[in-house]
Amino acid sequence: VSRRIRIGVGPVDGRSPRYGIDQLDTVLDGMWWGDNVLWVVDDGLSSVDVVLAGVIALADGRDVSDRGFSRGAFDLRDHASIGAVADTACTVVREGKTALWICPRSSVPPALRELAQVIVDQNSTHLRVERADGRRSQVVGTEMPYAVDDGIATVGPPSTVSRLGAGLRSIRKQRGWSQADVGAMIGVSGSAISQTERGTQSLSLDTAVELAERLGVSIDHLVHGADRSYELSRPASFGRGPSRLAPSSPQHFRIVAFATMSLSSSSTGSVSICIGSGVVKLEMADDSIVLGPGDVVRTTGSELRACRNLSAHPALIFQVNEHS
C-alpha cells in the first residue's frame, strides 16, 4: 500500500455496515452512515488485507460519486489525486455513504485526516482507535491486540491498560486539565500520565485507586471515562434515528467555502446546531466533530467555539438556543 490510498464503499441497501471484526464493531458500534473511516497502517504492512477482509468483501460495487468507482486507488504523488480524495470524502458525508480509506502512515493526506470521523491506527500487533466522532469519549485510545495465523486474523478484546488510559484522558479533557496537572495529584510526571493515556504504561492498582480518590470518582468511572459534551443525531434515511430541532426560532448562518465562523451562545440551557447543507467541523471546548446535511448536535452554549467549512461549497447551519 506504499504511497497509495484505497477506498471501499459499504453496502447502501439499509443494512448496518460493519467492520466484520467483532471487537471493533462492539467498540465503535459498527460503521455509521455518513462516516469516512481512515485506516492508517505501517508502510508495507501485509496484514491489513487479512484484518479488513470482512469489510472489503462488503464493498458492494456502488458508486460513491459520479467518479465511477466504489473500490479504487489514488496515487498520493499526484496533486490532482489528493484533491479528488478530499472531494470524495466530502461526498461521502453529504450523501450519507460509508467509506473506508486505507492509507500508509507516511502519506496520509491532511485533508482526509481533517474529514475523517473515525481513525483507526494499525501496526504489526495492535489496532488503536485515534478518533471516533459521536461515540463514547472513552473509545478514543482503545487498543486491541491482533494476530494473523494461516491467513485468518484474530482480534482480542481491548486491553485494560488502554481502557484506563482512554477513560483518564476523557475525564482530564472534560475538566480542562493538563497531563502535568493530573500527574501532580499523585506525584508523577506529566510524561507518565501521557504514557498511561496512550496505553504504553500502566498505573499500579494502588496508584489508580489514589488517582480515582483525588479525582473524586470511582475506579469504574475512571476506567469508563466521562461522557461526551454533546449528543449527535443523524437523518433516519442514513439508517439511524430521526433528527429534529427544538421548537424554537433558529438563527441561520451561511459559511463560505473553507471559512471559519466563530460560534458562541449566552443560552443558559442546551444549544442545538443543525447542518442544512455542506460539510463542516464543529469545534467545541474540548472536542470537535465532522458534520453533514441533516446532522444535529446538542450541547451547551459554553462548549461552542467555532464552525469550519471543510468543503468548496457554502455551508448552511442553524443554531437553536433552548433556554432553561
Predicted regions and their residues:
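Glycine- and acidic-residue-biased ligand/ion/polar-headgroup-sensing regions
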Residues: T268-A285
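P-loop NTPase motor core
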Residues: D66-E114
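Ligand-binding loop in jelly-roll beta-barrel domains
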Residues: G301-S324
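Short basic helix-loop element that most often maps to the first helix and adjoining turn
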Residues: A166-M185
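Short acidic-glycine-tyrosine-enriched beta hairpin
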Residues: A285-R305
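Phosphate-binding/switch region of NTP-binding enzymes
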Residues: C103-G151
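Glycine-rich P-loop/Walker A and Walker A-like loops and their local beta1-loop-alpha1 context
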Residues: S16-D63
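A short, N-terminal "cap"/entry segment at the start of jelly-roll beta-barrel domains
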Residues: L205-A257, L263
